[in-house]
């Protein structure tokens, strides 16, 4: 097995610099089975041909004669899936950096955390992530270093600093007293200040815009149901972002904030906790995907106090956790698009796949849960022509597990093989 970051207390320099993987100019993967995530079926005995990191053929193994000298990866005892995708991550934060603990994390330390957590996330089988909120555009640098092959990590789409109101969830500096005079990177009030902040984020290289239209669980002094940004302000933000070809992810727990975000044209709603039937129908009508992190409540309520989560945040999580899960079930049953996103860093990085079983518990089939982290996530992120399926012409981003994830989706918590762009980062 290649060096396993997930199960080790230190990191191999070779892997972090991107040299632990290997790729052949012509590679064949002999799979015991592959998952067709579009059709929702498992196909036995397939061989995947890869050239220069791209899938060039997917063929029944009985019909394939592998050329002499070609690279062969034998996964005949495994089921192969497209690389998994998480649409709501915070790679530059750690799960013990909550509450007052967050005040001692410098930007350089956050950047180093990002290098570590990117490698852990890739080892867990997540080959693409959308990072929604990071200080100082450090996520832009992390994305670029991964893309250049300088460090190991998933493909990243990044937002830079979240944009939010003074004193809101996206400007969570409420732990500091007034005399410090600290204002976080993304604070903007009023339509024109918001447009300027969108332009600044675009200038510094973001792939998308993240904003907050309600308070949050982990931000001090904010209410989950309180609207942050008026409809006018959100419309200005979305309009400016779309002018620059950037999608918008909106953090929203409360009903009014969710409604405003959908009406403003948001491309996804994050958390979406307090859903009414009216808002569910509005999301369905507008085709607005929901990214609902229904695993994190367990970690917050069992481990949160030890990791610095504030008492008021624990109380808010007790209020919202079960309600969010019930909203998830109702939105799913109504046919709203649901995309896999976990809010990693609230819980330890690498445990992303634990959410699959909760999605099934609260209404999805295993096939739907897998689809939410592949095809649907790729569509939301705008990369469906590159990743998200095992198909000719797409990047060779592949993971393998022992067993059938459509029979037991929890096996995705134990990925045994990871390939990204034709390079192997983990193998049995």
Map each language-model feature to its residues.
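Histidine/acidic-residue-rich catalytic or RNA/ligand-binding cores of hydrolases
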Residues: 95-99, 219-221, 258-264, 294-309, ...
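His/Asp/Glu-enriched, well-ordered alpha-helical/loop segment
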Residues: 104, 243, 247, 312, ...
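Metal-associated gating/positioning segment near the N- to mid-region
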Residues: 78-150, 165-170, 174-176, 232, ...
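Metal-dependent enolase-superfamily TIM-barrel catalytic cores that perform enediolate-based chemistry
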Residues: 24, 182-264
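Alpha-helix-loop-beta-strand connector modules within alpha/beta enzyme cores
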Residues: 144-162, 224-250, 287, 291-295
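Histidine-rich, glycine-flanked metal-binding segment
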Residues: 24, 34, 39-81
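Active-site gating loops and adjacent loop-to-helix segments of metal-dependent hydrolytic enzymes
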Residues: 93-110, 166-182, 217-231, 286-321
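Divalent metal-dependent hydrolysis catalytic cores, especially in the metallo-beta-lactamase
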Residues: 113-139, 153-161, 206-219, 247, ...
């Amino acid at each position: 097995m290649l060096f396993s970051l997930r199960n080790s207390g230190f990191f191999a320099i070779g892997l972090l610099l991107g040299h632990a993987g290997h790729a052949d100019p012509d590679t064949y993967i002999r799979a015991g089975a592959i998952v067709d995530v579009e059709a929702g079926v498992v196909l036995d005995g397939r061989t995947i041909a890869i050239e220069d990191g791209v899938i060039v053929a997917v063929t029944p193994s009985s019909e394939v004669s592998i050329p002499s000298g070609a690279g062969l990866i034998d996964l005949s005892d495994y089921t192969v899936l497209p690389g998994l995708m998480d649409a709501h991550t915070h790679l530059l934060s750690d799960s013990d950096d909550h509450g007052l603990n967050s005040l001692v994390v410098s930007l350089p330390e956050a950047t180093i955390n990002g290098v570590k957590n990117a490698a852990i996330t890739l080892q867990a089988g997540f080959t693409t992530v959308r990072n929604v909120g990071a200080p100082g555009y450090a996520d832009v640098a992390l994305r670029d270093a991964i893309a250049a092959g300088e460090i190991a990590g998933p493909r990243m789409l990044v937002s830079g600093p979240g944009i939010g109101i003074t004193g809101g969830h996206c400007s969570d500096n409420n732990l500091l007293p007034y005399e410090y005079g600290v204002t976080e990177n993304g604070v903007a009030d009023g339509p024109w200040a918001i447009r300027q902040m969108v332009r600044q984020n675009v200038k510094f290289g973001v792939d998308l815009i993240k904003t907050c239209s309600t308070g949050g669980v982990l931000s001090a002094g904010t209410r989950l149901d309180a609207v942050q940004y008026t409809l006018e302000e959100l419309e200005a933000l979305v309009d400016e972002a779309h002018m620059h070809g950037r999608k918008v992810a909106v953090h929203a727990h409360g009903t009014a904030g969710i409604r405003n975000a959908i009406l403003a044209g948001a491309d996804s709603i994050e958390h979406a906790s307090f859903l009414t039937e009216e808002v569910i129908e509005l999301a369905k009508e507008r085709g607005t995907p929901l990214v609902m992190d229904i695993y994190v409540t367990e970690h917050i309520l069992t481990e949160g106090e030890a990791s610095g989560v504030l008492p008021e945040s624990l109380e808010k999580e007790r209020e919202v956790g079960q309600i969010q899960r019930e909203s998830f079930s109702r939105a799913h049953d109504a046919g709203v698009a649901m995309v896999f996103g976990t809010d990693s860093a609230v819980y330890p990085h690498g445990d992303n796949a634990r959410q699959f079983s909760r999605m099934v518990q609260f209404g999805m089939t295993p096939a739907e849960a897998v689809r939410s982290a592949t095809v649907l996530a790729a569509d939301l992120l705008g990369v469906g022509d590159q990743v998200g399926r095992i198909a000719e012409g797409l990047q060779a981003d592949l993971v393998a597990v022992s067993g059938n994830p459509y029979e037991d989706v929890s096996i995705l918590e134990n990925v045994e093989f990871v390939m990204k762009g034709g390079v192997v980062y983990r193998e049995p």
